Regions:
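Surface-exposed loop/turn positions
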Residues: 54-56, 115, 300
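Charged- and aromatic-enriched interaction segments used to assemble
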Residues: 83-223
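Acidic, small/polar-enriched beta strand-loop surface segments
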Residues: 1-5, 110, 179-327, 337-344
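Assembly/oligomerization scaffold segments
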Residues: 1-105, 169-170, 202-221
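C-terminal output/interaction extensions
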Residues: 101, 342-348
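A generic structural motif
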Residues: 37-40, 84-90, 194-197, 287-289, ...
Length: 348
C-alpha cells in the first residue's frame, strides 16, 4: 500500500459514533507500557459531555474496514479550547495501575503462595477488576513456558501492574542458550473484548513474517546503535560476586550490575548471563516509516532488505505509532538488532 492509501477512521465513545475527528496519535511498545491514544475533535457538542473514564474505540480502517479496533480503552484526560477538544486514553490495563485505588496486599496469612503469575493475574482480574463487567478480557491469557510463582511475595499497597511486571521479569526461557527469551505483557483487541496476555519474544532465527524494502513498505529508515553491556555482575546473599563477560570486548568493557541477591553462585551467574544477552538484543535501533502492515503485532519478526549490510537482516518489532491528521496517515515501527552468536562467548 502507498502512503496515500485511503483511511477512514471511526471513533466510538460508549458505542456511539463521534464525528468531527481531526487527528489522533496511537502508540504501543514492547516494554510493558500501556497503549495510549490521543485524539482531537472539532465537535462542539463534546464539550457538554462528561467523557472522563468513558469507553472509547478507534477503528483505523486503513485501506479497508477493520473487523476489530486498533485501540480500545478508557479516557483518562480531557482538555478543551474554543474550537477543539482533546482526549487522552489508555488501554484497559490501566485498571491494574493502582490509580483507581485497587492495590495488592500479601501477608503471611493472606497471600498467593503456590500460584503461578498467570493464575494470580486471572484470579485478581476476575475478582477485583471484572466484578461487575468485563473490563479486561481473560480468554487469551494462558500459562507461559517458564512459569514463575508468587510464593514468598509479600507486599503492602502495591500497584498490581508493578507487581506483575516485576514478577514477569524473572521469567526467562533460556532453553536456547544463544538467545534467551523474555516475556512482555500485551493486549489483544478482539471484536467485543480486549484480552490481556503474556507474549514471549520470537526467536530471530524464525522465519520473518514480513519483508520490508525501499520498493515495498519502507518510506523512511533511520538507524542508530549504542554500545551494549558486555559484562554482567551478580552477587549471592553471602556476598560472592559472579561476573560474565560476553565477546572479546574490543571497544572496552561496559558492565551492568543486577539488583537483588541470589541464593547460589550458579543462580547469580545464570542471571548475569541472561541479563547481558537480553540487553544485547536491544542496542541497535531501527526507526521505519512504513506504508504497509499497520496492524502488525509487537514482537513480530521482520526482514529488512536494504543495501546497507550493517542494517540488512531480521529484527523484532518493538514499538509502533500511528498518526492521522487531516486524512494523512503515518505509521512508524521501531525494531531491535540482529541475533547474537554463540561463538562470541567467553566464560570468565
Amino acid at each position: 500500500m502507498s502512503q496515500n492509501t485511503y483511511c477512514s477512521p471511526i471513533v466510538y465513545i460508549n458505542g456511539k459514533v463521534i464525528d468531527y475527528l481531526e487527528s489522533y496519535n496511537f502508540s504501543t511498545a514492547m516494554n510493558n507500557t500501556l497503549q495510549t491514544l490521543k485524539l482531537t475533535f472539532t465537535n462542539p457538542d463534546l464539550e457538554n459531555l462528561d467523557l472522563f473514564g468513558e469507553k472509547i474505540e478507534l477503528y483505523h480502517n486503513y485501506g479497508s474496514l477493520d473487523g476489530v479496533p486498533l485501540f480500545r480503552g478508557y479516557i483518562t484526560q480531557i482538555s478543551a479550547t474554543d474550537t477543539k477538544i482533546t482526549a487522552n486514553a489508555q488501554d484497559p490495563r490501566l485498571y491494574l495501575s493502582g490509580q483507581d485505588g485497587i492495590t495488592v496486599d500479601t501477608t503471611d496469612s493472606k497471600n498467593y503462595d503456590g500460584m503461578t503469575l498467570t493464575q494470580f493475574l486471572y484470579s485478581f482480574i476476575s475478582t477485583e477488576v471484572n466484578a461487575d463487567s468485563t473490563v479486561i478480557g481473560l480468554s487469551s491469557l494462558t500459562e507461559i513456558d517458564k512459569p514463575v510463582y508468587m510464593t514468598g511475595i509479600r507486599e503492602r499497597h502495591q500497584a498490581p501492574w508493578n507487581l506483575i511486571t516485576s514478577t514477569l521479569a524473572k521469567a526467562i526461557d533460556d532453553s536456547n542458550f544463544s538467545e534467551p527469551l523474555d516475556y512482555f505483557i500485551d493486549i489483544n483487541h478482539r471484536q467485543t473484548t480486549s484480552d490481556i496476555l503474556f507474549r514471549k519474544k520470537s526467536l530471530l532465527a524464525d522465519k520473518a513474517s514480513y519483508i520490508f524494502s525501499y520498493f515495498d513498505g519502507i518510506v523512511e529508515l533511520r538507524y542508530k546503535e549504542r554500545p551494549p553491556h558486555n559484562v554482567g555482575v551478580a552477587r549471592t546473599k553471602d556476598g560472592e560476586t559472579q561476573r560474565f563477560i560476553y565477546g572479546n570486548t574490543p571497544s572496552g568493557k561496559k558492565a551492568i550490575t543486577l539488583k537483588g541477591n541470589f541464593e547460589t553462585p550458579a543462580e547469580a551467574r545464570k542471571a548475569a548471563i541472561n541479563k547481558v544477552l537480553l540487553d544485547y538484543n536491544d542496542t541497535k535501533e531501527i526507526d521505519m516509516t512504513v506504508s504497509k502492515c499497520h496492524g502488525i503485532s509487537l514482537g513480530t519478526v521482520v526482514y529488512i532488505n536494504v543495501p546497507d549490510d550493517n542494517i540488512r537482516g531480521k529484527y523484532r518489532v518493538t514499538g509502533k505509532t500511528i498518526s492521522f491528521n487531516n486524512s494523512k496517515v503515518t505509521c512508524k515501527l521501531k525494531c531491535n538488532q540482529k541475533p547474537i552468536r554463540v561463538s562470541d562467548f567467553i566464560n570468565n
